Protein backbone atom coordinates (compact mmCIF):
# COMPACT_ATOMS: atom_id res chain seq x y z
CA UNK A 1 0.00 0.00 0.00
CA UNK A 2 2.63 2.52 1.06
CA UNK A 3 6.25 2.60 2.11
CA UNK A 4 5.44 2.38 5.83
CA UNK A 5 3.51 -0.86 5.49
CA UNK A 6 6.40 -2.27 3.44
CA UNK A 7 8.92 -1.29 6.10
CA UNK A 8 6.87 -2.81 8.91
CA UNK A 9 6.31 -5.97 6.86
CA UNK A 10 10.08 -6.30 6.29
CA UNK A 11 10.65 -5.78 10.00
CA UNK A 12 8.03 -8.37 10.99
CA UNK A 13 8.89 -10.97 8.35
CA UNK A 14 12.68 -10.61 7.98
CA UNK A 15 14.60 -8.37 10.35
CA UNK A 16 12.93 -9.37 13.63
CA UNK A 17 12.79 -13.17 13.04
CA UNK A 18 16.44 -13.19 11.91
CA UNK A 19 17.39 -11.12 14.98
CA UNK A 20 18.92 -8.36 12.86
CA UNK A 21 16.80 -5.77 14.66
CA UNK A 22 14.72 -5.85 17.81
CA UNK A 23 12.08 -3.67 19.38
CA UNK A 24 13.62 -1.06 21.64
CA UNK A 25 10.42 0.45 23.01
CA UNK A 26 7.15 2.10 22.08
CA UNK A 27 6.16 5.71 21.58
CA UNK A 28 2.65 6.81 22.54
CA UNK A 29 0.44 8.34 19.85
CA UNK A 30 -2.00 11.17 20.42
CA UNK A 31 -3.69 10.70 17.04
CA UNK A 32 -4.35 7.85 14.69
CA UNK A 33 -5.89 4.43 15.19
CA UNK A 34 -7.10 3.74 18.74
CA UNK A 35 -5.14 0.49 18.94
CA UNK A 36 -1.88 2.32 18.23
CA UNK A 37 -2.80 5.06 20.71
CA UNK A 38 -3.17 2.39 23.41
CA UNK A 39 -0.07 0.30 22.71
CA UNK A 40 2.06 2.96 20.99
CA UNK A 41 4.15 2.67 17.88
CA UNK A 42 7.28 0.53 18.15
CA UNK A 43 10.81 1.72 17.50
CA UNK A 44 13.76 -0.55 16.89
CA UNK A 45 17.53 -0.84 17.14
CA UNK A 46 20.06 -3.05 15.41
CA UNK A 47 21.25 -6.12 17.25
CA UNK A 48 24.90 -7.14 17.21
CA UNK A 49 24.14 -9.23 14.11
CA UNK A 50 22.45 -6.20 12.54
CA UNK A 51 25.48 -4.03 13.27
CA UNK A 52 27.74 -6.60 11.59
CA UNK A 53 25.52 -6.60 8.50
CA UNK A 54 25.40 -2.78 8.47
CA UNK A 55 29.22 -2.68 8.48
CA UNK A 56 29.16 -4.56 5.17
CA UNK A 57 26.93 -2.02 3.40
CA UNK A 58 28.92 0.75 1.71
CA UNK A 59 25.97 3.17 1.62
CA UNK A 60 25.87 3.36 5.43
CA UNK A 61 27.38 6.71 6.43
CA UNK A 62 28.36 6.24 10.10
CA UNK A 63 30.15 2.91 9.95
CA UNK A 64 33.00 4.06 12.22
CA UNK A 65 30.47 4.59 15.01
CA UNK A 66 28.81 1.25 14.23
CA UNK A 67 32.18 -0.52 14.40
CA UNK A 68 32.80 0.88 17.89
CA UNK A 69 29.29 -0.13 18.95
CA UNK A 70 29.78 -3.61 17.47
CA UNK A 71 33.02 -4.18 19.38
CA UNK A 72 31.53 -2.73 22.58
CA UNK A 73 29.18 -5.74 22.48
CA UNK A 74 31.81 -8.27 21.46
CA UNK A 75 32.72 -11.42 23.31
CA UNK A 76 36.28 -12.02 24.49
CA UNK A 77 36.94 -14.33 21.53
CA UNK A 78 36.02 -11.48 19.16
CA UNK A 79 38.21 -8.87 20.88
CA UNK A 80 41.35 -10.09 19.11
CA UNK A 81 40.08 -8.55 15.86
CA UNK A 82 39.12 -5.17 17.36
CA UNK A 83 42.57 -3.59 17.55
CA UNK A 84 43.79 -4.62 14.11
CA UNK A 85 40.51 -3.71 12.38
CA UNK A 86 40.42 -0.34 14.16
CA UNK A 87 44.02 0.36 13.08
CA UNK A 88 43.34 -0.76 9.51
CA UNK A 89 40.23 1.42 9.43
CA UNK A 90 42.34 4.55 9.90
CA UNK A 91 44.77 3.79 7.09
CA UNK A 92 42.67 1.61 4.80
CA UNK A 93 38.91 1.99 5.33
CA UNK A 94 37.92 0.50 1.98
CA UNK A 95 39.93 -2.65 2.67
CA UNK A 96 38.62 -2.90 6.24
CA UNK A 97 34.97 -2.66 5.22
CA UNK A 98 35.57 -5.07 2.34
CA UNK A 99 36.46 -7.67 4.96
CA UNK A 100 33.05 -7.21 6.60
CA UNK A 101 31.40 -7.33 3.17
CA UNK A 102 33.15 -10.61 2.30
CA UNK A 103 32.27 -12.06 5.70
CA UNK A 104 28.55 -11.23 5.40
CA UNK A 105 28.46 -12.33 1.75
CA UNK A 106 30.00 -15.67 2.72
CA UNK A 107 27.19 -16.08 5.26
CA UNK A 108 24.55 -15.17 2.65
CA UNK A 109 26.10 -17.70 0.25
CA UNK A 110 25.95 -20.40 2.98
CA UNK A 111 29.74 -20.62 3.12
CA UNK A 112 29.72 -19.55 6.78
CA UNK A 113 27.18 -21.23 9.05
CA UNK A 114 26.65 -18.44 11.60
CA UNK A 115 27.52 -14.73 11.56
CA UNK A 116 28.16 -14.75 15.28
CA UNK A 117 30.43 -15.18 17.01
CA UNK A 118 32.46 -12.96 14.70
CA UNK A 119 35.52 -14.96 13.64
CA UNK A 120 37.61 -13.84 10.69
CA UNK A 121 39.24 -17.27 10.55
CA UNK A 122 35.98 -18.36 8.90
CA UNK A 123 37.04 -16.35 5.83
CA UNK A 124 39.98 -18.69 5.33
CA UNK A 125 37.50 -21.48 4.59
CA UNK A 126 36.01 -19.66 1.61
CA UNK A 127 39.32 -19.08 -0.19
CA UNK A 128 38.61 -15.58 -1.51
CA UNK A 129 41.02 -14.75 -4.35
CA UNK A 130 40.99 -11.00 -3.75
CA UNK A 131 42.04 -11.48 -0.11
CA UNK A 132 44.84 -13.78 -1.23
CA UNK A 133 46.01 -11.14 -3.75
CA UNK A 134 45.85 -8.37 -1.15
CA UNK A 135 47.90 -10.43 1.30
CA UNK A 136 50.42 -11.26 -1.42
CA UNK A 137 50.93 -7.64 -2.46
CA UNK A 138 51.22 -6.46 1.14
CA UNK A 139 53.80 -9.14 1.94
CA UNK A 140 55.77 -8.23 -1.17
CA UNK A 141 55.47 -4.48 -0.56
CA UNK A 142 57.04 -4.56 2.91
CA UNK A 143 60.10 -6.32 1.44
CA UNK A 144 60.68 -3.68 -1.26
CA UNK A 145 63.33 -0.99 -1.05
CA UNK A 146 62.20 2.62 -0.56
CA UNK A 147 62.64 3.38 -4.28
CA UNK A 148 60.77 0.23 -5.33
CA UNK A 149 57.95 1.11 -2.91
CA UNK A 150 57.69 4.58 -4.45
CA UNK A 151 57.65 3.05 -7.94
CA UNK A 152 54.98 0.54 -6.91
CA UNK A 153 52.81 3.32 -5.49
CA UNK A 154 53.18 5.36 -8.69
CA UNK A 155 52.22 2.30 -10.73
CA UNK A 156 49.16 1.62 -8.57
CA UNK A 157 48.16 5.29 -8.78
CA UNK A 158 48.17 4.98 -12.58
CA UNK A 159 45.91 1.93 -12.66
CA UNK A 160 43.42 2.86 -9.93
Task: Describe each PLM feature range.
Residues 2, 41-42, 153:
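Intrinsically disordered, low-complexity segments enriched in small/polar residues
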Residues 2-25:
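Short amphipathic alpha-helical interaction segments
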Residues 10-12, 21, 49, 56-64, ...:
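Functionally constrained cores in energy, signaling, and assembly domains
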Residues 19-37:
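Beta-hairpin "wing" of winged helix-turn-helix
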Residues 35-70:
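Short, amphipathic alpha-helical interaction segments positioned at domain boundaries
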